[in-house]
Amino acid sequence: MIETERLILRPWLKDDILPFSAINSDEEVMEYLPKCLSLEETVQFYNRIVAEHDRFGYGLYAVETKSDGLFIGYVGFHHFDFDAGFSPGVEIGWRLAKEYWNQGYATEAAKACLDYARINHLFNEIYSFTTVGNHRSERVMQKIGMSRVCFFTHP
């Protein structure tokens, strides 16, 4: 578990599935992703997240607010191995419910994840990527100290 001033980043609970599905089915949240996810697809995603965390001891963390204990999305690490010049690797990523956008939550949680990775010597390199035009994600990347290395076509 990782704590920040306002957030708790923790392992996933089955109770997270329905609010996670609501996030994944929101067209505005999913605007820069291939498609919205159904409940069944969200359950499959949840299972992959839990399996990756079980395998490595870290992964995409469920994010909840300290003030009210509500699940608001995820932030954390994901192993990728798609065909790219920098693959395989570890990505830091985030997805929050839109009512929690523009409040610094993604930046706060992502910084805490990077600090955790540094302190525990988890990775030599961490990547983050987004779709051209997703300025919100680009701003988070900049705020956590990442810099653009390249453009690529995601398979």
Task: Walk through the language-model features, giving the residues of each.
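Acyl-donor (CoA/ACP) binding surface of acyl/acetyltransferases
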Residues: 1-31, 62-155
